Structure formats: structure tokens, C-alpha cells
Amino acid sequence: MIERNYYLNKLIRNMWNGEIKVITGIRRCGKSVLLFELFYHYLLAQGVLEDHIIRIELDQRRYYRYRNPIILCEDVEKRIHDKAGDQFYLFVDEVQFTSTVRDEENGGIEVTIYDMLNELKSYKNLDVYVTGSNSRMLSKDIATEFRGRATQVHVYPLSFQEFYSSVRGDKQTALDQYMLYGGMPRVAGMTDERDKKEYLTNLYEELYIKDIVERNNLEREDILNAILDYTASQIGSLTNPTSIANALTSMRHEKINTSLVSSYLDHTMDAFLISMARRYDIKGKSYFNYPNKYYYTDIGLRNARLNYRQYDPGHMMENIIYNELIIRGCSVDVGMVLDRRNKEKIQREIDFVVNDGDRRIYIQSAYQMDTEQKENAETQSLKLTGDFFRKIVIRMDIPHNFFDADGFFHCRLIDFLLQEVELY
């Protein structure tokens, strides 16, 4: 079993903190394993009795009755009500499958899973943990629905460091596999490449697409697929719903509305399939509305979406770096800086402006810088920031790390992903 110590330790630190622990992330990224295996076995090792851990998996048929939140709440209360001296743990998996129901015993008012979990939270002998695969369970929604009393633990597919801890062997070979097949936990345990491709393709088509269509009652699954094809082929490129709509209109010979594209993009982000990096004006200290960049939560899913036809190592590397920074808890934007050195003012791009509290770094992703022209193209925007924050160029084509004459740190991708270098 692959260790997910970063997330496990976060759960352990927040035990009995008086809040509901909400574990979010794309489906099949390891949320259930984290809660129902890793954390479960940790509790058993600490002496917690097995019958004091209440496990409810809402995507399993034997637990379908608990999709009614009133039934779930009542059954849990029966287990713990007369045992105030004992400590119980409640695990609820894939909580987004619950329904809103009417409580006929209380005037027919509508009741949600949030209402019932808030009621259960009032029991001092119960510590509550739930998982969910939809971003409506994130940020302000968690604060609102759980009345400001929730701790969020967002789980991602395996980082390269986690992936390599499982597969071991030659680091470059492992990185090549990671760039092609990504970090979905089950893939890390597979050896046959056909099995990996089949698993990722089925995951995409039979789980994610169906989830998005059914959950949001989408009428145009074909448009959703076209949008996903387009974003997969354009990772690392600036785009927006209007340009996507125009491209699809041209390709499909039918009018595709920008509002439809924008709505469908939101649904894919709600499902954690893709995420958006906004453009940030470094000198003006403000955000642009459009265009932005879209990245896949797992690069293997992106490659599966394109049937492994479009192997673009430069943009794939950029996607992997973005994901790694997000996994580390950083705030990541696409940097823009105005070049006034010539008569024509040009907006130049820095791949990532990375903020962690009051600390900032700039990162350029450079697959190859084997000519002076390429080196100038990658570094000139870094020279225009006008500040003294650290500037890093992450590369695939160098045998060791070094500082150049401008003080920019050139770092091997493998060293960055294995956290063998300090960012700040």
C-alpha cells in the first residue's frame, strides 16, 4: 500500500478538534484508501475498538439506504446515544451521493446531509470524517454548510515523490512513466502498459464523464467531450471560453455558445478533473479576467483523453510542475510583465508566480534550453520583474543544478519533484 503520510498526518493532527473533517479530491485519487484503510488502521493500532468505527460507503449498494441523510443520522445516533463514555468515529464516503429529503415528522422541511452531520457533530463522543468528489464541498461552501466548523483535507493523485516511493528503481525511468501515465494510485501498481492505458481510459469515460453528465443533468455530452479534448490539447496555453467556443464552432460546423462552454468548464472543475491558473500582472499587482490556463489534475488522464497521440513533453512538464506546487499548498498564478524596452510594448509571461504566505518565487518551466535563443526566451521575462524574489528555471536537459550569471537557479525536474532542493 502506498503511504500518504502528508494527508494521514493532517488527519491525525485534527482528531477531536470539534470540527467535521472533510476529505475532498477527484474520484479514485485515494481518498477512500486514506480514510478507510490508512487512518482506519492507525486508529486500530492506537487501541480503538473496531465496532467504535462506523463506516458508511455511499457508492456501495449495501449502503444506498444511507443516501437518505435522516436514516443515516438516526442509525448513527442509535449506535452512540447511550454510550457517552465511549469515543466513536464516523466515516462517510462520497457524501455527494446523498439526497435532499423532507422531514415529515417536523413539518416537511427539507433536510440535507449537512444538516444531519451538523447534528451529529454536537455529540461529544463522536468524531466525524466525510469524503467528497465535488468542489461544491470546498472553501466557502464548507464554511457555510458546516457553519464554519469543518477542517478540509484535499487529496490529490500521487505526487512524483509518492509515486517513486512505490515503484523505486531508476529515477528517470520512473519519471518517464509518470509523465505518460500520471499518478492515479492504482496505475502505480500496474506493470503492463496496456493495462494502464485501459484503466485510465475507462476511468475517464465510465466514471468522470458519466458523473459530470448525470450530476449536472447535461444535455450535450458530445460538447462536453469536445471541450475536454480541446483543453487536453491546449494545456499550458492561454485560452478562454470564447476562444474555445469559436474553435468548436469551426470544427463542428455548428454554433457553440460561450455561455455553454463556460458552464461545462465549471462542471469539469467542480469534479476536480481540471483546474484553472489565472493571469497576474506582476507590476500592476492585479488579475486579468481572460485568458487563463487550464491544467489537468492528473497528466495521465490528460494523455488518456487524447489516446496518447499528442505527446508534448514541454507542456506536460509544465502541467506536472503546476500540480506539484498545488499539492505543496502554494498559490499559483501565471505571471505577466510588461516589456517596455522597445517601441512596441510586449506582455511577457512567467510560467508560475508562486506564493506561500509572504514568500514568493518565480518559476519557468523549460524542457530544453540548448540554444542561446531559447535561453533568452525563457529568462528575459524573469529579468523584467524588478524585484528580488527568487527566480528558478526548472529543466529536463541539465546534469546538475546551478546558478547562472543573473542569479537564476537552474534546477533539474527530478530534484524539484523529489523535493531535494529548497524552493525559498
Per-region residue spans from a language model:
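Short glycine-rich substrate-engagement loop in P-loop NTPases that contacts/grips substrate
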Residues: 55-85
